[in-house]
Amino acid sequence: MKNKPYPYYTNEEYHDLKQMVYSKAEKIPYKPAFSFSAAKNAVVTKTFKDFCDDVEAFGTYLLANGYSGHTGIIGENSYEWLVAFFAVVNMGAVAVPIAKDLSADEIAQLIEKADCDAVLVSKSYADLVSVQDGIKLLSLNDIPTYINSGLERIQSGDTSFRNSQINADKMAAIFFTSGTTGSSKGVMLSHKNMISDTIFACRNFRLTGDSIAVLPFNHTFGLITAIMAQFNYEFCSFINKSTKRVSQDLLTAKPVGTFMVPLFIETFYRTIISTAEKTGKLKKLQTAEKISNALLNVGIDLRKQLFKSVRNAFGGNIEYIICGGAPLEEKYVKKFRSWGVYLYNGYGITECSPVVSVNRNSYWRDGSVGPVLKGCEVRIVADGEVLVKGDNVMLGYYNDEQSTAETLVDGWYHTGDLGHIDTDGFLFLTGRKKNLIILSNGENVSPEEIEARILNDDAVSEVVVYDDGGQIVAEIYPADGFLDDKPHFDSLIRQINDGQPKYKQVSVVKLRKSEFQKNATKKIIRYKVQEEQNNV
C-alpha cells in the first residue's frame, strides 16, 4: 500500500492505570475483556466489570492483610496473574513481575534485588521459590478465594482499595531486563510511564478486533503493549497460558490481530512452507502468490480466498500481527503481506515502557520500525545512537544509580541502539552500539547489518556475526535440510561479500548443530556465543 500520512487516532486519556480500569467498568461493564481456556477446554469469559471487581476485591484483601510493599509475581500467563498485577499497582504498591523460566537461584536473586516483601507464585512454579524469613508467600491459584474474602470486606463497608490514592509519578513496577549482554537490571516504571506509552501507541496504531495474548506478561511488550493497549481499545483478549498451546488457542480465539516476537513469525513461516512441501502444494502456493500480487497491482484483492489455509493456521480471522522484541527480517513482512496478513514491525525497549515507534495501519515502510510515537521524541546523535525522551521513559534502574546516570542524561535515554530516521520520519535500526566490531584499522562493522543479509537466505535459520582475532566470523545454524551443506553457505557468503568493502567481508563460515541460546524474549544471547568460542 502506498505510504501516505494520515491523522493520528484519538483515544481516551487516563491519569493512571486505576482510573483506566474503573473507567472501562463504568463505560462498558458487560463487554468481554478477557477469555481463556479452563477445564476440558471450556472457554471462560470475563467482562470489564468482572475484571474491575476482581481487582478491587483482591486489592482489598491484600491491604487488609498488610501487603503494601514490593510484591513479586511469578507464573504462567493467566487471568489471575493480571488481577494480581493490577491489584498491586492500583493500591499504590509496587509489582515485580519475574520470569517463570529462570532457575531457582536466579529467581531468589531477583526477589532480593527488588526488595520484595511478598511473592505471588502459581503452583506450577512454587518449587522454584524459596523465600527468606519475613517474605510472605501467596498462591496465584488461590486468588479466587482471596477475591471472595475481599468481597466480604467490601460488602461490610471496606473502601480502603477504592479510596487509595495513586501518585502517577512514583514507581509502580520493576521490570527486569532480559540481559543479552550480562546481568538483568530492574527498570522502574510509574503509572505515568505505562499509561503514557499505552496512549502514545494507540494514537499510532488502531486495533480492529479481538486479540490473543501469547507473550509473557512479565515483559513490558507482553503486558503493557498487548494487554493495556487492547484494554484501551475495548476488545477482548484471549489469554494463552503456554507456548505449547498457541496453535490450539489461535483456533479457539480466532483473533483479528495479535502481538508476537519474530521467533513466532519464523516458526509459523517454516511450518507453512514445510506443510506445503510435504503435501505437494508448494508450487501451487508460489503460483497463487504471483497471481495475487499481479491482481493487487490492478486493485483486485483475492488474498482471503487464495490463502485461506494460511489464515486458518491463525484461526481464520487474522488481519495483522504487531511484531517487536527483536529484529524482524523484511522477507517475512513481504511474504505474509502477500498472503493477506500484515506484519507491522515496531521498536520498543523496557526502559521506554516499551514502545518507541511502530508502523501504522496504512502508513508503513518495509525495513523500518515505523514512525516515532506522537508524544515521544527521538534524536540520533553523531555516532548514530538512538536517544529517546518522553513521559514513557523510565524513572531509572532500581538501586543502581551508576547505570541510571550512564544511560539517562538530561531526560534523554541512551538506548545503545544505532539507527537513522528517513525524510518521512521512519526509524531504521542498524545494530547495537555494544556489538560493533572495531577492527585494528579503525573501521567499525555492524554485525547486525551482515546478519540481515545472510538471513535473507531460506537455508539460514539463525546467524551470529562476530570478530575472532581480527577475522569476521559468520556462525550459522542452518534450516532443516541444510545442516551439512557447507558448500551452499560458502557460496552464499561469497555472494554477500561481493561488492562489499574488504573490511566488511566475512572471512570464516561456521555451521552449528543446535540453536543459539536465547533469553526469555527469544533474543540470541550474544555473550554466550563469545563464551562458547572462548571455551573451544
Task: Identify the function of each model-found stretch.
Residues 258, 302-427, 433-436, 450-451, ...:
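Conserved AMP-binding/adenylate-forming
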Residues 29-32, 155-176, 183, 206-210:
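Conserved pre-ATP/AMP-binding loop-to-beta segment of ANL
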Residues 102, 119, 380, 390, ...:
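AMP-binding/adenylate-forming catalytic core of the ANL superfamily
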Residues 45-49, 172-198:
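Conserved AMP-binding A3 loop
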Residues 34-65, 69-78, 82-86, 103-108, ...:
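Conserved AMP-binding/adenylate-forming core of the ANL superfamily
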Residues 195-210, 217-308:
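Conserved AMP-binding/adenylation subdomain of ANL enzymes
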Residues 40, 126-168, 272-309, 513:
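ANL superfamily adenylate-forming
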Residues 462-464, 469-470, 494-536:
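Conserved C-terminal "lid"/linker of ANL adenylate-forming enzymes
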